[in-house]
Regions:
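Conserved pre-ATP/AMP-binding loop-to-beta segment of ANL
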Residues: 7-30, 37, 60-66
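Short aromatic/basic micro-patch
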Residues: 19, 42, 118, 224
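Conserved S/T- and glycine-rich ATP-binding loop of Class I adenylate-forming
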Residues: 25, 31-34, 67, 117, ...
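Conserved AMP-binding A3 loop
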Residues: 26-50
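Short, surface-exposed connector motifs at secondary-structure boundaries
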Residues: 37, 64-66, 90, 164-171
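Conserved AMP-binding/adenylation subdomain of ANL enzymes
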Residues: 49-66, 73-160, 194
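Conserved AMP-binding/adenylate-forming
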Residues: 117, 154-235
Length: 235
């Protein structure tokens, strides 16, 4: 080692393999099959690059920020967003060592305080229904919500409590992978909680639509990502 690298190992010693074409196969990712039967999806470098580049353009992760990786890396969103994007952004990646139950996930948020969170709806729904909604889901709480001044204070308090449950350090929560509970979504919108809903599939590597939480419209899944062609067809 000392003979080959007399002045230590430096960036110029690194030689990455260069693909012959952006269309060259990068990974075969197995999926249950949004567009049909279960299959191995052949994703080219172009697809992975486009997704990672879009994350850099739209999401506020900076070197040293924390990301909790909850999805398995065999899941295309976990691979592209949590790993490839987080790694290339210089973030610190934290992997759960136990099955990701809502309790364990909430504990990890409190300890790690991630900058941005991506998860399936069920996680947000269970945490909100268990730790936040019971505080106002009673006769007194519902009565106070009808009083304008008190209503604003309650919403501010609920937002603060909800932020604390998820670590208090995040810019937004990106939700996707399944329909979001309408009751929970209405509540989060009422208290001004920073969430957004995105849409994608393995075949697209995976991001198709996304919008920043400040411009996100409830009931939607954002706008088409750059370099992505979206066509709406009738049934």
């Amino acid at each position: 080692y000392g003979t080959r690298f007399p002045k230590n190992f430096r960036p110029e010693h690194i030689s990455y393999r260069k693909e012959e074409s952006p269309e060259e196969l990068a990974v075969i990712n197995y999926t249950s099959g949004t567009t049909g039967y279960s299959k191995g999806v052949m994703l080219p470098y172009r697809s992975l690059w486009s997704n990672v580049a879009y994350c850099h353009e739209m999401l506020p992760v900076r070197p040293g920020d924390h990301i909790v990786s909850m999805l398995p890396l065999g899941h295309v969103f976990g691979m592209v967003y949590d790993f490839l994007y987080g790694f290339s952004a210089g973030a610190h990646l934290y992997f759960l060592t136990r099955m990701p139950s809502p309790k364990i996930i909430a504990q990890s948020f409190s300890e790690i305080r991630p900058r941005i969170i991506s998860c399936v709806p069920l996680i947000v729904e269970k945490i909100i229904k268990k730790d936040i909604l019971p505080r106002i889901d009673n006769k007194i709480g519902k009565l106070l919500l009808r009083m304008p001044i008190v209503n604003d204070k309650i919403k501010a308090d609920m937002r603060k409590k909800a932020m604390e449950v998820f670590g208090s350090n995040f810019d937004e929560i990106i939700i996707g992978g399944a329909p979001f509970n309408a009751e929970v979504e209405r509540f989060l919108k009422q208290i001004g909680f920073p969430y957004t809903i995105a849409y994608g599939m393995t075949e697209c590597g995976p991001i198709i639509c996304y919008e920043d939480w400040t411009r996100f419209k409830p009931g939607s899944c954002g706008k088409a990502a750059p370099r992505m062609e979206v066509k709406i067809l009738s049934s």
